[in-house]
């Protein structure tokens, strides 16, 4: 994994390239680039084995729109510079898919696997308390979400602690997204980033930009290798497999898998969660080293693990026509340039993995409305469909089966609505980027995505007199 300094340098370099291409005045460019504030938080917690002091960060990159939005990462490797780079990326990611948030990110230096659930809850609640003290979490100012090392459980603790500290805030549960459904979370948030990758690829394959690659056929006919089978990688693999694509390779830290005819991703995920002992894996012929799978031929490579996994030292090993960035910053800036020169098209992270914040936006809106999606329309839709079916039966003289009637009458579920909204946001964002790319002949889709988002920030800053 690349160092934190390499990560922030890479994000900054990619931003600088876009700014230079756009020709933005230096002072305004520095305003857009600068991280507005980074808060270092140290706090002690009394655990089962004594008092321990933890260090966390919350960076706010841009408040051109509020609240600011970005996840909280639990990792022993997290640092202030990493959090700042991710906050910067969040600003542009939010702008690309047109959600009304500025960019923020948080991190806690901790290995969560080393602590009991009871201790982890204490740590999370204390961290939340420190964030609340500093105005770094609230429905109107700063709204965290899950990231590496965190999930629904941690978000539930954060939401509950915020509500305990702010008992009169009717919108308290909107202080964080990615919560369990019974606390105001939405069905589909866990899969959102991975499914968003599928929608990003589908949008690309449905565009004329496909002609810019050496890829033949539609998305269903592609062979795909995915680096990282965590939440992002698994749900991307699942959506792509269900669409008809073939997942031929999975790269994990300690063990990788390859089968040119396709892998059983559910089997692999279960094995990774339950055993991870090579001798226990049932299909021994599918076990390979990381380097062997990394360099295997494929149509699409999806790095979905962590930042800096593709560098100037290993980019030449890749044998792919297209890269879709599932992780934040998986390519260093030099690797990005080398691969572009090599003719490999890259769908960048600030667009490709924006599905998570898109669905977080839906959850935040739902929490403010205090009403589940579809509540006002469900019965009306059922009556409309029933009337339509009756007209069809009368006009054709044919009876429609009960199964078909039930399917049409039940209407869309919450996850149907969430997926529909996510697909619309990802499709519209790609169409807008593609139009700009083809009109201006920018050097890459990444540069185009940055320029597209930077233009929105420029407009926001000009509106407030900067």
What are these regions (language model features)?
Residues 2-6, 204-205, 321-466:
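Adenosine-phosphate binding glycine-rich loop
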Residues 2-42:
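Short, Gly/Pro- and small/polar-rich lid/capping loops
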Residues 75, 94-220:
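Glycine/serine-rich phosphate-binding loop and adjoining beta1-alpha1 elements at the start
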Residues 6, 10-13, 36, 78-81, ...:
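Conserved active-site and cofactor/substrate-binding residues in soluble primary-metabolism enzymes
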Residues 40-114:
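Glycine-rich, N-terminal phosphate-binding loop and its surrounding beta-alpha-beta segment
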Residues 255-346:
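Rossmann-like adenosine-cofactor binding region
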Residues 184-295:
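Glycine-rich phosphate/diphosphate-binding loop of Rossmann-like nucleotide-binding domains
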């Amino acid at each position: 994994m690349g160092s934190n300094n390499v990560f922030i340098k890479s994000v900054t370099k990619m931003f600088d390239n876009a700014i230079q291409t756009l020709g933005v005045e230096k002072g305004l460019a520095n305003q857009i680039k600068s991280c507005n504030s980074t808060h270092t938080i140290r706090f002690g917690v009394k655990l089962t084995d004594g008092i321990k002091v933890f260090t966390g960060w919350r960076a706010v990159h841009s408040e051109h729109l509020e609240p600011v939005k970005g996840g909280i990462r639990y990792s022993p490797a997290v640092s202030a510079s990493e959090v700042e780079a991710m906050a910067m990326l969040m600003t542009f990611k939010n702008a690309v898919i047109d959600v009304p948030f500025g960019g923020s990110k948080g991190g806690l230096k901790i290995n969560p696997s080393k602590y009991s659930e009871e201790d982890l809850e204490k740590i999370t609640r204390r961290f939340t308390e420190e964030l609340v003290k500093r105005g770094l979490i609230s429905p109107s100012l700063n709204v965290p979400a899950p990231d590496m090392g965190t999930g629904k459980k941690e978000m539930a603790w954060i939401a509950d602690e915020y509500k305990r500290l702010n008992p009169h805030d009717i919108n308290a549960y909107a202080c964080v997204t990615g919560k369990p459904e019974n606390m105001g979370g939405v069905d589909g948030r866990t899969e959102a980033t991975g499914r968003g990758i599928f929608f990003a690829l589908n949008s690309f394959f449905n565009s004329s930009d496909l002609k810019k690659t050496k890829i033949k056929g539609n998305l269903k006919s592609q062979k795909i290798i995915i680096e990282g089978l965590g939440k992002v990688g698994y749900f991307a693999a699942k959506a792509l497999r269900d669409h008809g694509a073939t997942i031929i390779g999975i790269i994990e830290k300690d063990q990788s898998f390859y089968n040119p005819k396709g892998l059983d991703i559910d089997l692999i995920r279960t094995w990774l969660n339950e055993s991870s002992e090579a001798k226990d894996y049932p299909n021994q012929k599918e076990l390979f080293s990381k380097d062997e799978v990394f360099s295997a031929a494929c149509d699409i490579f999806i790095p979905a693990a962590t930042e800096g996994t593709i560098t100037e030292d290993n980019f030449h090993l890749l044998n792919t026509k297209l890269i879709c960035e599932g992780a934040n910053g998986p390519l260093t800036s030099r690797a990005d340039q080398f691969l572009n020169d090599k003719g490999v098209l890259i769908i960048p992270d600030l667009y490709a993995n924006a599905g998570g914040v898109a669905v977080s936006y839906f959850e935040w809106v739902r929490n403010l409305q205090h009403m589940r999606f579809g509540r006002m329309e469900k019965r009306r839709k059922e009556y409309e469909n029933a009337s339509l079916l009756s007209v069809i039966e009368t006009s054709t003289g044919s009876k429609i089966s009960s199964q078909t009637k039930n399917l049409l009458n039940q209407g869309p579920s919450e996850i149907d609505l969430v997926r529909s909204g996510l697909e619309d946001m990802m499709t519209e964002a790609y169409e807008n980027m593609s139009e700009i790319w083809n009109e201006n002949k920018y050097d890459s889709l990444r540069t185009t995505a940055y320029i597209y988002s930077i233009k929105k920030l420029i407009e926001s800053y000009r509106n407030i007199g900067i």
